Amino acid sequence: MLPWLLVFSALGIQAWGDSSWNKTQAKQVSEGLQYLFENISQLTEKGLPTDVSTTVSRKAWGAEAVGCSIQLTTPVNVLVIHHVPGLECHDQTVCSQRLRELQAHHVHNNSGCDVAYNFLVGDDGRVYEGVGWNIQGVHTQGYNNISLGFAFFGTKKGHSPSPAALSAMENLITYAVQKGHLSSSYVQPLLGKGENCLAPRQKTSLKKACPGVVPRSVWGARETHCPRMTLPAKYGIIIHTAGRTCNISDECRLLVRDIQSFYIDRLKSCDIGYNFLVGQDGAIYEGVGWNVQGSSTPGYDDIALGITFMGTFTGIPPNAAALEAAQDLIQCAMVKGYLTPNYLLVGHSDVARTLSPGQALYNIISTWPHFKH
């Protein structure tokens, strides 16, 4: 089994930080985390008993009735520890209120499916349940499907987490290893450098994982035979299907089957028109895949990968999980050689007379790497 890598990050500072959060304060936080940093390996190796009895459930902190649905396969090899400033609290009542505010921010401002982390540790020394052990968080793009995301919150501005919080995080990490949620083998921890860094990045690096793809056999594809694709493709075309969308895996599998039937039975195509489809559940569904031509964009189908978001996105864009999944798929395609290194990313409307992918989605992809109007 691959070793897991512990990554300290300051992601989340962008959302809740302020201009007074400077390098000196970040350094103070970094120094305060060194105790945790230096003792995690000793804790897990000694197998010390842990106490997570102070975990506050979602119900107890008043979580909004939303939720992410993408399963996380455990044990994972990576643990990402975040620090979320700007939510000072020192008792369960206030920390629960701050966590509700954070969840609302992630859902309503960031278009997330829930609070971004698997678990959070308040400055009151309690562990707060996020999305839990078995669901992917949306905390670190490119790593959500291979990592657990833990976060400190409630810390007074410019201060490191309290001794109670550090102890709670130690116990949480040790518990994760002992219960099989986190791999027991690991390398020397890495301090990840974010927008506002906690410590300098060391030489060790971690490659992003290619996202998991729901294969045709799982969503119930009809057997077909279509022209082969010559790779690498020169274009990535972003599309929307129009019509209804889906938010949970069962709905998305049904929708993909319906789209395939529409292409085959109504449009007389040899198969579903896209190489891959992205659901609002944050999952990627295999269309015709990497090696077969799609049929959504005549004149480009033999030189382009068609990636479609299921739904209509003229006014409201896809949620954060769906957008991240698509970006990870594109990055994976380039790394694996399915896209040329100098590929061009375009909207469907750039190469065909159509409103797809919708203005709201188009506005977002126009900021992505390799975009060409």
From Swiss-Prot:
Residues 1-17 form the signal peptide. Detected in skin epidermis, eccrine sweat glands and ducts, mucous cells in the submandibular salivary gland, mucous cells in the throat, ciliary body epithelial cells of the eye, small intestine, colon, stomach and in mature epithelial cells of the tongue (at protein level). High expression in skin and esophagus. Expressed also to a much lesser extent in the tonsils and thymus. Residues 293-302, 353-354 are annotated as: Interaction with murein. CDD domains: PGRP. Peptidoglycan binds at Y263, Y274. It holds the Pfam family Amidase_2. Disulfide bonds join C210-C332, C226-C270, C246-C252. Glycans are attached at N22, N39, N109, N145, N247. Keywords: Antibiotic, Antimicrobial, Disulfide bond, Glycoprotein, Immunity, Innate immunity, Repeat, Secreted, Signal. One of its GO terms (molecular function) is zinc ion binding. The keyword Membrane does not apply. GO terms for cellular component: extracellular region; membrane; protein-containing complex. It comes from the Eukaryota. Residues 74-212, 235-358 form the N-acetylmuramoyl-L-alanine amidase domain. Pattern receptor that binds to murein peptidoglycans (PGN) of Gram-positive bacteria. Has bactericidal activity towards Gram-positive bacteria. May kill Gram-positive bacteria by interfering with peptidoglycan biosynthesis. Also binds to Gram-negative bacteria, and has bacteriostatic activity towards Gram-negative bacteria. Plays a role in innate immunity. This is Peptidoglycan recognition protein 4. The lineage of its organism: Eukaryota, Metazoa, Chordata, Craniata, Vertebrata. The gene is PGLYRP4.
